């Protein structure tokens, strides 16, 4: 069954899941409001108001939180594009695409571990799915 699966289909599917991950990170994570919980509101207010010097720039923890969230979104969009392009390469030259597929697979496995340790179930599930798809694409790209 696995030998009949085309690596480019697996890569395109992983690519679309990366796009979904980027959209969820942005709209459900960065741009969503609070639950209204007083403790949560207090933490967010402190993150937005307490300033400190960061290498000569006055910043807040909110700046870092929001900025790193945007960095993650941009990186996931880049991965979406790269996996989509890698799918085209896997169609014509799977042996050349294979090391890149392996690198992305390892990265998403590491992302899943970090999400399990520091975040929550939604990114963890997406990252596990992407890692599995990439692992299958890696195995199928031998031919």
List each language-model region with its residue ranges.
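Alpha-helical transmembrane segments of helical membrane proteins, especially in multi-pass transport
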Residues: 65-84
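Juxtamembrane membrane-water interface segments that cap and precede transmembrane helices
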Residues: 49-64
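Hydrophobic alpha-helical transmembrane segments of integral membrane proteins
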Residues: 91-129
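Juxtamembrane non-transmembrane "cap" segments at the membrane-aqueous interface
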Residues: 35-46, 93
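Juxtamembrane helix-break-helix junctions at the cytosolic face
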Residues: 3-4, 78-97
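Alpha-helical transmembrane segments and their membrane-interface exit regions
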Residues: 129-141
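Residues within membrane-spanning alpha-helices of integral membrane proteins
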Residues: 11, 15-22, 69, 73, ...
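N-terminal signal-anchor transmembrane alpha helix
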Residues: 9-37
């Amino acid at each position: 069954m696995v030998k009949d699966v085309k690596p480019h289909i697996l890569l395109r599917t992983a690519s679309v899941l990366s796009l979904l991950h980027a959209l969820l990170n942005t709209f459900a994570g960065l741009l969503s409001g609070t639950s209204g919980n007083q403790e949560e509101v207090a933490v967010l207010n402190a993150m937005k108001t307490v300033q400190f010097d960061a290498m000569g720039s006055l910043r807040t923890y909110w700046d870092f939180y929001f900025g790193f969230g945007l960095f993650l979104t941009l990186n996931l969009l880049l991965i979406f594009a790269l996996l989509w392009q890698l799918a085209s390469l896997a169609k014509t030259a799977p042996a050349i695409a294979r090391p890149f597929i392996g690198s992305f697979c390892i990265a998403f496995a590491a992302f899943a571990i970090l999400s399990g340790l520091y975040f929550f179930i939604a990114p963890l599930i997406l990252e596990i799915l992407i890692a599995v798809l990439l692992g299958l694409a890696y195995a199928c790209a031998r031919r």
